[in-house]
Amino acid sequence: CKGKGASCHRTSYDCCTGSCNRGKC
C-alpha cells in the first residue's frame, strides 16, 4: 500500500479493505 487514503484523516488507510480503518492489516 502506498501512503494513506485521501479521505482518511485521523484514521489510517486499510490496504486490505481499501477503506479507513484504525487497525492494521
Swiss-Prot record:
Superkingdom field: Eukaryota
Cited InterPro entries: Conotoxin_omega-typ_CS
UniProt cross-references to SUPFAM superfamilies, sorted A to Z: omega toxin-like
Single GO molecular function: calcium channel regulator activity
The protein's name: Omega-conotoxin MVIIB
UniProt feature coiled coil, ranges: none
Keyword Glycosyltransferase in record: no
Disulfide bridge partners, by residue number: C1-C16, C8-C20, C15-C25
Organismal lineage: Eukaryota, Metazoa, Spiralia, Lophotrochozoa, Mollusca
Primary role: Omega-conotoxins act at presynaptic membranes, they bind and block voltage-gated calcium channels (Cav).
Modified residues (Cysteine amide): C25
Localization per record: Secreted
Tissues of expression: Expressed by the venom duct.
Description of its domains: The presence of a 'disulfide through disulfide knot' structurally defines this protein as a knottin.
